[in-house]
Swiss-Prot record:
The keyword Acyltransferase does not apply. To Y.pestis YfeE. The lineage of its organism: Bacteria, Pseudomonadati, Pseudomonadota, Gammaproteobacteria, Enterobacterales. GO terms for cellular component: plasma membrane. It is found in: Cell membrane. This is Uncharacterized protein YniB. It is a multi-pass membrane protein.
Amino acid sequence: MTYQQAGRIAVLKRILGWVIFIPALISTLISLLKFMNTRQENKEGINAVMLDFTHVMIDMMQANTPFLNLFWYNSPTPNFNGGVNVMFWVIFILIFVGLALQDSGARMSRQARFLREGVEDQLILEKAKGEEGLTREQIESRIVVPHHTIFLQFFSLYILPVICIAAGYVFFSLLGFI
């Protein structure tokens, strides 16, 4: 793969990463709001007021975002107190797959830019040598760009989901939803 191809692949990876990340994030957030809205317990005191406030705010968000109706009506409602939440977890994982794609594309883009600048610098030195200097094509033919896989993005693909799950567990436990 040439560095020009690597630059194009990097742009495609970044675009695909954002295209996967944004809908997955919106769907996950709406799923969590729907989970919070399904809670219909009769509590007393400040807990009842806070639960009613939460329901009103979620209903207001749904009413004021008609452009997100696709997500409001189709995002899976998780049940963390039991049951299978396969679709919710698949969509949740897609957030981090999108981030890993974007990170991989950003890394490839940086490398392609560095290689392009290196070729230009080397070309200047080769022209200073005169006739025995290498041409641009000869320099470019010697460059081997490694393939980048999203599985090497350790933080965004492996560590960040665990941090988000732990923070979500603490958040929902403190609010009494789990």
